[in-house]
Structure formats: structure tokens, C-alpha cells
Amino acid sequence: MFKKPIIIGVTGGSGGGKTSVSRAILDSFPNARIAMIQHDSYYKDQSHMSFEERVKTNYDHPLAFDTDFMIQQLKELLAGRPVDIPIYDYKKHTRSNTTFRQDPQDVIIVEGILVLEDERLRDLMDIKLFVDTDDDIRIIRRIKRDMMERGRSLESIIDQYTSVVKPMYHQFIEPSKRYADIVIPEGVSNVVAIDVINSKIASILGEV
């Protein structure tokens, strides 16, 4: 008999430790069927634009995401049907030509900077988490990640942070904290918060 999946929303600023918290939850339930879906996968396709136009996109604004498509796919998973999730190419600043097949799972972790900003997404979630990390730590992590994984220059990262990332954090991301069921200071290093979250998930799954 198909059992409706649990959806957990994990948000916070860029470089704040959202993915680490999500992976800590994944690792705590080795026998459960858990998937992590990132909002970043649903950045809009920009193949019709020149590369010069693409790099100017504000990726921290709600309009950069095809959230309608994400909601549609989450509803498919909730109904027990597999979906083909888009894959975003950060170096080309548009979607790649490949997708990832995701089957329904017991738990679906939805992770991204704006997943609590959209009421329609929030309404699909059983647990909503906000990872609250100091600004200095987040920018250092972002610099390391974008230079190593996304081929960005230091100058471009700092320019984007001051002109886009920081203003968007205060306009859209930080205000969404009020919708969180649990706020996690310092992310995955907050062992007490992670234990509380895992206990709640276990109770829903019937593991306790």
C-alpha cells in the first residue's frame, strides 16, 4: 500500500549549511527511502539567451526559479509517480540536456534558499527548517564553493554577493524564517537541533 511521503523543507542563506543539514538527516535514516531535491535544479532554462545575458541573471530572486514546475513534480511524487528532475549547468548558466529520474520515497527533503518563500511550497511541507548562519561564514563558504565547483573568479563572486546575494537575503530569505518550525543556529554543528529533528521524523515514520 502506498504511503504519502513526508516533505521536509530546508532553507537559509547561500553557504549557510543547508545541504550539510540535509545530508545529516539522510545519514540518520540508512534504512529509510529518502530523497533530496534541490530548488536550484529548477532554475529557469536560459538557452534562448546569450551567455552574456545569462550571467546577469539574479539567481537569488524568486523569478529565477521555475517553482511552478517544482510544485508540479512534488505533487507527482506525493501521488506515487516518478518524475524527471532537470539538471542545471552552473558553468553555462542554463539547464543541461539531461534529467534525473526520481522515484517516490518515504521522505523528500526539499532544499534551497527560497523554498519557504513560496506559500504553495510551504503548504506541501510537513516540517520546515531554517538554517541560521553568520554572514561572514556564509560568504567564505560561498567563495570556496563557487571557485572550486563552479569555475567562478573571486572578483565575480564578491561583486555578485554585494550587489545581489546580500540584498536578496534580506529581502526574501531572512523574512521566510518566520515560517520555519525550527530555526537551526550554526547548522549541522548544532547536534541538539539535529537530534530533535530526527526524533520528529522518526515518530512520523513510525520508527519509535
Curated annotation (Swiss-Prot):
Binding-site positions, ATP: G12, G13, S14, G15, G16, G17, K18, T19
Subcellular location, principal: cytoplasm
InterPro entries per record: P-loop_NTPase, PRK/URK, Uridine_kinase, Uridine_kinase-like
Biological pathway: Pyrimidine metabolism; CTP biosynthesis via salvage pathway; CTP from cytidine: step 1/3; Pyrimidine metabolism; UMP biosynthesis via salvage pathway; UMP from uridine: step 1/1
GO terms classed as biological process: CTP salvage; UMP salvage
Localization of this protein: Cytoplasm
Molecular function terms, GO-annotated: ATP binding; cytidine kinase activity; uridine kinase activity
NCBIfam families attached to this UniProt entry: PRK05480.1, udk
Protein name, per record: Uridine kinase
Organism this protein belongs to: Streptococcus pyogenes serotype M18 (strain MGAS8232)
Lineage: Bacteria, Bacillati, Bacillota, Bacilli, Lactobacillales
